[in-house]
């Protein structure tokens, strides 16, 4: 399985190698070719046009090198295809049309009519053991095609012409069978597998990619030859030159047999079939176009050997007894032999090809090295190169045949194998030796070829035998070299296939040169019977197709070998002049091809320069876009910085405003607290003033009571003095005693009256005082209770008012704070909205400017790109026209030699020019598509940016609406806060009024309390005054008692003792009024004065006791009042 090329599978590289692979594919079986083509189509549907054009170009550019037997091989290869006939035949038509013309003379009518004419080409194209192996080889190539995607690019151009050298044989076959090949040719480029594998990713310009190859400009045969070297590595000039010269492919293959793979050439067991099944298809005949799905089946591999047996039966030899046919299976042990180096597949070491440039033996050697899989027999298409064509025409396809192998093998053995050997030096040395050998054997080969064609019987065995002898004779000089260069291949194994290939290709070589139509026809007609009976049992024989022909001939019967030797000698003798002419033509073509290679290299350099300029322009565009993006980012950064600075300033202003408002609130709070403190101080002063006023009132009342009491005491003192004077005057004399008694009585009566009056007044006053005091006490208690209740109510009301005031203040502060916050937020949002609007406007302006700049840049870039594309396309058109002119010159030279080659060259030039035009248009389309994709991407980017801007506008609009809604909410909130603040102020005023009323009530209560306290003080003073009066009275009584004791006892005896206690008890029990009445009654029968005095004294004593008790009670009462007054003052305080 050939791996793909390393650099993304450059599709244009393997086109000519793919041709050679297609020859191998045709020999292995066309039925297997199509699965690979299908698999390849899946990945390369978009590149069918490139592949089709490449296939047409290659097929038509190399038409002159196709052998006459190619149409027959094509028919055999296309026999067993199911649904792919139309596609395959499409491409074959363009390739094989010249071959039809070439074959018109020998047997034009037999090609379409006979089902086996395709097989007739096989004996002439491929080795003897596989004359009918084209069907089998086509089958085997399909498996190889699945493995090597690069092999099917233009393989179907020679798909039906499997036995031809990649270029020349397809042309010859198209000349020989025009109708059949044209039916088959044009459909082949349409098959998916034959399309060049151009991957869409290669349109992306990579530094290591070949732009010309990617765009399809390298699809020409010259470009393909250059690309053969690219698959193996970077060897542009040397490899291309050697490929154009046709050097070293087979020779290097012989020199390095193990280059493709380091495995022994052993045939796989599944391909080694017993000889008993060789005759399965031997007796079957097929009409042209008949569908036999089993013809190309796995049994078809043995049909090749069977047809070979048949061939040798016609020549008198037993094919089954032939050692070469039995030993050939181990010849190709490696299933993937096409992975050899570029020199091996290019056949630079093949001396036989150089010795006989026009002979099909060269072609056989070259294309026998093409087989890719072990099941691929030596491609018969290699041997169908007409002798008339220059060897260079057959060599480039031979060189291109190695490209699929190199493509399959590039990843493994590319660098290591080419570094080990200098295959170019070997190719040059072998070229010199081959030139000498060519001159020596020219005459002999010519004579032998003429003899072989003259004695050609119409049967298929006779021309085959003659061609075998011719090839063997021609290969005699190079057999030693080929045997020496193949150390890994057993001579017995490889001899038969090589000999058969040479013999098969000998007849068409001679016939086109000399124009012997009967010989060609006889060689072609009997060959048509072979394809149906071919069942190749040697799938891997083509691995080493360049075995010495002498060994192969030695395996044949002696009579056959002698006949072939004689034919080869005659041909060698007759052909020196023609070989020399062909050598001159090949040299001229070599010079032309070298010039074309140089032109193509220059063209590639120009395209690389164009790519560099495009890349520079693209880089400039990218830099411009980046600069615009950077400028936009800078503008955005500046706008955002300005916005941030603006927001910072607003934040600072708002914070300063908030601090000032906080300070104002603190000042207001301090003022309110100061006012409250002043009010409390005024209330305290008023309370103290009321207390002082009450105290003054009480003092005044007490002073009045004291004054009254003192006046009474003064009167009592006067009375006492008078009594004392009376008592002292009574002791003077008795006469005066009566007077004194009378006076005493008067005095006692007056005293009694006075005492009764005093007592009555005292009782009344005391009672009144007691009642007044009780009433006052009750009033005082009630007032105290009421005052305490009012104080408690005032305290509660004050606490409630204070709480309400505190709550209202807190609520007012909170509402004011919230209001300020809302105002700040509203102002911040408004400023933010304004700043965002300004920034949005700036962004809009900036984006509009940037979009305008970008549009202008895009227009300029588009115009510049279109101008460059136009200039490049004009240059490409000029180069293509120049190449077309060179192709015209080359066709003119070919027309001088052969009319058929001239027509084919003209057709190839026409197809090439058409292909170039289509390639130019496709390249333009590709570039336009790329630019359109870039423009679409830019448009998408602009659309995305526009959508982003629209989205930002939407967001800003929504933000603005949200800000407006927030502003409305804030306004409503502000109104609510204002209304609440009004309500709070009203409530605060109500609280102030209630506080003032409470303070007034408190002041009134304080005034009342002070008045009560003053009254209490006044009463206390009065009590003290009365107490003093009582004390004075008690002293007076004591004095009276002393005075009574001082009286004479006679006065004391007057009073009955029994009546004393009674009187005392009566005085104690009776009120003072009856005592006074009793005292006022004078005693009967006794002296009234001493009794009266005694009674008066008892009465006074009793009154003194009563006064003492009264004073004690008053004192107790005053003490209780003092305690109560202190409590009241403490409560009021």
From Swiss-Prot:
Chief site of localization: cytoplasm
Gene source species: Homo sapiens (Human)
Ranges of Basic and acidic residues composition bias in the record: 102-113, 221-245, 259-276, 415-424
Keywords: Cell junction, Cilium biogenesis/degradation, Coiled coil, Cytoplasm, Cytoskeleton, Isopeptide bond, Phosphoprotein, Ubl conjugation
Function field: Keratin-binding protein required for epithelial cell polarization. Involved in apical junction complex (AJC) assembly via its interaction with PARD3. Required for ciliogenesis.
Subunit structure: May interact with FAS cytoplasmic domain. Interacts with PARD3. Interacts with TRAPPC14.
Biased composition (Low complexity): 125-134, 295-310, 473-482
Cross-link (Glycyl lysine isopeptide (Lys-Gly) (interchain with G-Cter in SUMO2)): 960
Biased composition (Polar residues): 165-182, 325-336, 459-469
Coiled coil: 577-727, 773-870
Biological process terms in GO annotation: apical junction assembly; cilium assembly; establishment of epithelial cell polarity
Protein name: Fas-binding factor 1
């Amino acid at each position: 399985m050939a791996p793909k090329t390393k650099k993304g599978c450059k599709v244009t590289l393997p086109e000519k190698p793919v041709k050679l692979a297609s020859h191998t594919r045709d020999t292995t079986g066309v039925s297997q070719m199509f699965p690979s083509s299908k698999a390849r189509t899946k990945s390369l549907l978009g590149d069918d046009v490139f592949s089709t054009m490449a296939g047409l170009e290659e097929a038509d550019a190399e038409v002159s090198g196709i052998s006459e037997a190619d149409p027959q091989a094509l028919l055999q290869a296309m026999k067993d295809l199911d649904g792919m006939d139309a596609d395959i035949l499409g491409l074959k038509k363009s390739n094989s049309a010249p071959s039809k013309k070439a074959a018109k003379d020998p047997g034009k009518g037999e090609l379409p009519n006979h089902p086996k004419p395709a097989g007739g080409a096989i004996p002439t194209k491929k080795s003897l053991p596989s004359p009918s192996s084209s069907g089998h080889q086509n089958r085997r190539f399909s498996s190889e095609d699945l493995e090597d995607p690069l092999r099917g690019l233009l393989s179907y151009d020679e798909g039906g012409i499997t036995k031809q050298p990649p270029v020349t044989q397809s042309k010859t076959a198209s000349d020989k069978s025009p109708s059949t090949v044209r039916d088959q040719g044009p459909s082949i480029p349409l098959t998916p597998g034959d399309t060049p594998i151009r991957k869409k990713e290669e349109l992306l310009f990579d530094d290591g990619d070949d732009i010309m190859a990617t765009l399809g400009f390298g699809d020409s045969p010259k470009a393909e030859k250059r690309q053969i070297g690219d698959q193996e590595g970077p060897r542009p000039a040397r490899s291309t030159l050697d490929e154009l010269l046709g050097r070293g492919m087979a020779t290097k293959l012989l020199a390095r047999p193990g280059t493709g793979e380091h495995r022994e050439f052993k045939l796989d067991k599944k391909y080694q079939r017993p000889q008993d099944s060789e005759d399965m298809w031997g007796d079957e005949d097929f009409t042209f176009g008949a569908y036999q799905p089993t013809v190309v089946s796995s049994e078809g591999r043995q049909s090749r050997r069977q047809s070979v047996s048949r061939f040798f039966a016609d020549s008198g030899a037993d094919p089954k007894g032939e050692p070469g046919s039995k030993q050939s299976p181990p010849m190709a042990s490696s299933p993937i032999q096409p992975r050899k180096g570029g020199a091996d597949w290019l056949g630079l070491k093949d001396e036989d090809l150089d010795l006989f440039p026009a002979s099909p033996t060269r072609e056989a050697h070259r294309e026998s090295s093409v087989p890719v899989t072990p099941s691929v027999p030596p491609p018969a298409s290699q041997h169908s190169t007409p002798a008339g064509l220059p060897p260079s025409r057959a060599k480039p396809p031979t060189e291109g045949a190695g490209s699929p192998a190199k493509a399959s093998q590039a990843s493994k053995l590319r660098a290591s194998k080419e570094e080990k050997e200098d295959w170019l030096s070997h190719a040059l040395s072998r070229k010199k030796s081959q030139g000498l050998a060519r001159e020596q054997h020219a005459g002999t080969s010519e004579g032998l070829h003429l003899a072989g064609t003259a004695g050609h019987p119409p049967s298929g065995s006779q021309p085959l035998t003659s061609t075998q002898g011719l090839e063997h004779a021609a290969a005699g000089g190079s057999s030693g070299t080929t045997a020496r260069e193949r150390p890994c291949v057993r001579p017995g194994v490889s001899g038969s296939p090589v000999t058969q290939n040479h013999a098969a290709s000998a007849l068409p070589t001679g016939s086109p040169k000399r124009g012997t139509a009967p010989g060609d026809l006889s060689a072609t007609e009997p060959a048509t019977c072979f394809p149906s009976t071919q069942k190749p049992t040697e799938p891997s024989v083509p691995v080493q197709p360049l075995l010495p022909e002498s060994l192969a001939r030695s395996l044949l019967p002696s009579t056959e070998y002698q006949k072939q030797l004689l034919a080869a000698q005659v041909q060698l003798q007759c052909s020196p002049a023609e070989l020399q002419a062909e050598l001159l033509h090949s040299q001229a073509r070599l010079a032309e091809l070298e010039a074309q290679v140089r032109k193509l290299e220059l063209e590639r350099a120009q395209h690389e320069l164009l790519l560099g300029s495009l890349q520079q322009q693209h880089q400039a565009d990218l830099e411009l876009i980046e600069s615009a993006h950077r400028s936009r980012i800078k503008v955005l950064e500046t706008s955002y910085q300005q916005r941030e600075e603006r927001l910072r300033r607003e934040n600072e202003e708002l914070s300063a405003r908030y601090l000032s408002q906080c300070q104002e609130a603190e000042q207001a709070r301090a003022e309110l607290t100061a006012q409250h403190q002043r009010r409390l101080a005024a209330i305290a002063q008023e309370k103290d003033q009321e207390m002082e006023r009450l105290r003054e009132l009480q003092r005044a009342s007490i002073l009045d009571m004291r004054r009254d009491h003192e006046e009474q005491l003064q009167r009592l003192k006067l009375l006492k003095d008078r009594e004392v004077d009376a008592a002292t005057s009574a002791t003077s004399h008795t006469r005066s005693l009566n007077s004194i008694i009378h006076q005493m009585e008067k005095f006692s009566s007056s005293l009694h009256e006075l005492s009764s009056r005093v007592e009555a007044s005292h009782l009344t006053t005391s009672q009144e005082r007691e009642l007044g005091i009780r009433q006052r006490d009750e009033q005082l208690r009630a007032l105290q209770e009421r005052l305490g209740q009012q104080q408690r109510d005032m305290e509660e009301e004050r606490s409630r008012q204070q709480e309400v005031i505190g709550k209202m203040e807190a609520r007012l502060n909170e509402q004011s704070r919230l209001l300020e916050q809302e105002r700040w937020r509203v102002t911040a949002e408004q400023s933010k909205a304004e700043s965002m609007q300004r920034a949005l406007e700036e962004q809009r302006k900036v984006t509009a400017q940037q979009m305008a700049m970008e549009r202008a840049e895009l227009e300029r870039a588009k115009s510049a790109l279109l101008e460059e594309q136009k200039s490049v396309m004009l240059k490409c058109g000029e180069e293509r026209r120049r190449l077309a002119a060179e192709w015209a010159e080359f066709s003119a030279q070919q027309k001088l030699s052969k009319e058929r080659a001239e027509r084919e060259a003209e057709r190839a030039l026409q197809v090439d020019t058409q292909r170039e035009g289509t390639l130019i248009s496709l390249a333009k389309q590709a570039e336009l598509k790329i630019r359109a994709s870039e423009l679409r991407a830019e448009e998408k980017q602009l659309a995305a940016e526009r959508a982003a801007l629209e989205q930002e506008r939407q967001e800003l609009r929504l933000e603005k609406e949200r800000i407006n809604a927030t502003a409305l909410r804030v306004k409503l909130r502000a109104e609510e806060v204002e209304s609440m603040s009004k309500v709070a102020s009203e409530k605060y005023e109500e609280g102030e009024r209630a506080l003032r009323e409470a303070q007034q009530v408190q002041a009134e209560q304080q005034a009342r309390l002070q008045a009560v306290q003053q009254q209490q003080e006044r009463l206390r003073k009065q009590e003290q005054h009365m107490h003093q009066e009582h004390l004075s009275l008690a002293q007076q009584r004591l004095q009276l008692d002393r005075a009574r004791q001082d009286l004479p006892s006679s006065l004391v005896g007057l009073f009955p003792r029994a009546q004393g206690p009674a009187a005392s008890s009566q005085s104690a029990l009776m009120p003072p009024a009856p005592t006074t009445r009793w005292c006022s009654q004078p005693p009967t029968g006794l002296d009234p004065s001493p009794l009266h005095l005694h009674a008066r004294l008892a009465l006074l004593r009793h009154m003194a006791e009563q006064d003492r008790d009264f004073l004690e009670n008053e004192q107790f009462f005053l003490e209780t009042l003092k305690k109560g007054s202190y409590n009241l003052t403490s409560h009021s305080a």
